[in-house]
């Protein structure tokens, strides 16, 4: 199974990076003048619209499924959670650097971190349901 999961994980990671890392430049600079809807930093937990939160959860479900298949030593709840948080934090940090250097109009959001972690552990839960076995040790 790992033989098929590894290319899927690589493609998945490349897709997530393509969606989250490139600067989001507005085609019209006046879009962000005056009353701006863009917030560069969102540090208030759970102050987010439900669709955005849900999409971030869904985006990380494959991570929680594929990572433990490709890297068996990551096959515990706590390790998948830690890897999900680390991956999400890496994305948010890259977005912050892009904002500071390129004016990339990306929002660095603590809610994305929470949603991505939830998605990762949900994916791991789905994997455990699909492949029952003895619980992994942390």
Regions found by a protein language model. Give the residues of each.
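Alpha-helical transmembrane segments that form the membrane-embedded catalytic/substrate-binding core
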Residues: 106-127
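Bulky hydrophobic segments
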Residues: 1-105, 124-138
């Amino acid at each position: 199974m790992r033989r098929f999961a590894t290319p899927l994980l690589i493609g998945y990671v490349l897709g997530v990076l393509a969606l989250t890392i490139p600067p989001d430049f507005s085609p019209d600079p006046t879009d962000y003048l005056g009353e701006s809807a863009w917030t560069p930093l969102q540090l208030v937990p759970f102050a987010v619209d439900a669709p955005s939160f849900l999409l971030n959860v869904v985006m990380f479900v494959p991570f929680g499924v594929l990572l433990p298949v490709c890297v068996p030593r990551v096959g515990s709840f706590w390790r998948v959670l830690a890897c999900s948080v680390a991956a999400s934090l890496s994305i948010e940090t890259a977005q912050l650097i892009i904002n500071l250097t390129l004016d990339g109009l990306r929002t660095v959001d603590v809610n994305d971190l929470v949603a991505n972690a939830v998605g990762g552990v949900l994916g791991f839960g789905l994997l455990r349901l699909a492949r029952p076995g003895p619980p992994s040790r942390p």
